[in-house]
Amino acid sequence: MKKIVLFLGSVLLLASCDVKDPIYNTPHPNHGIVMGLTEWSQRGEGVEVPAEYLVEVSGTTNTANATATATATTTANATTFTMPGLFEPGNVEVLAYNLLAGVSANGGIATVSTGTDGTLLVPDAGVLFSGVATVHVVADDTARVTLAMQQRMREVRFTLTITDGAPERITDIKARLDGVAASINLRTGEVIGNSASVMLSFLRKGDKLSANVWIIGIIEEAKQQIVTTLTFSDNHRIETTTDVTDIFHNFNADKLTPLSITGSLYAPVGTKPDGTIIDWKPGNGDGGDVDTNM
């Protein structure tokens, strides 16, 4: 009888040794975390990688033992990032972008702010980028994603040469470009919204007038035109409006290559010159350099 009891006890002891606690790989066995890498090769020559950028992950998050459908956001200053919080298993969208002064973002749409004169503000420094990808979150694991960041702005360079007349008579030049876009979809790169205008700040050095501006694109359905006002030393002003839609044909297709527009300007010697002294010529429309007459 004692032998039977001892035998049964041994069997129970051995059986209990086979019951083990589950072994997990992470402290979050029912959820996953999201880590990522940003890749910045798609940028124009001389364009720097932003010092910091925002990352949003849309999905079911788990923070402080509460689950909810929300967007987790973090600020990163390196090419790698780790999102805060935990995520339910399943697909989540990861969206990264950098914010510039005068540019806001809401719901994946970036919008350039408007100044007091009704024209778009031009960011003082930096270029807008964004990248998006979908990653599958697995419980008890880390989901890793690589975001190919895309340049979302393009530079326009205006260079005018005063070829005849009296350059010193030009005391001021004001110009604006109409038909540009104010908003862009950070996921797709599509420009949206109504047509807007941006000021062109020309500076004169000797016989050269130059202006550079960064824009997120043009509204293809709108007319692109340049409105220019020249002021001379006798306070006489000449304003012209010229259609330059052909010059900006396919402008949105290549954000990495600046659009360079060159031209010539005649500064009349006499007072109150007659005729139109600004005469923009249509460009070649292929996104390359454009030669105009002014």
Language-model segments: residues:
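A short beta-turn/strand-edge loop motif at beta-sheet boundaries
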Residues: R43-A51, D164-T171
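Tryptophan-paired
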Residues: A51-A110, R169-N250
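Structured interaction patches on ligand/partner-binding surfaces of diverse proteins
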Residues: V19-K20, T71-T73, A101-R144, N235-Y266
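Positively charged n-region of N-terminal signal peptides that target proteins for export
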Residues: M1-I4, V19
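C-terminal motif of bacterial Sec signal peptides marking the signal peptidase cleavage site
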Residues: L13-S16
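A sequence/structural signal for flexible, mid-protein segments enriched
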Residues: P123-L209
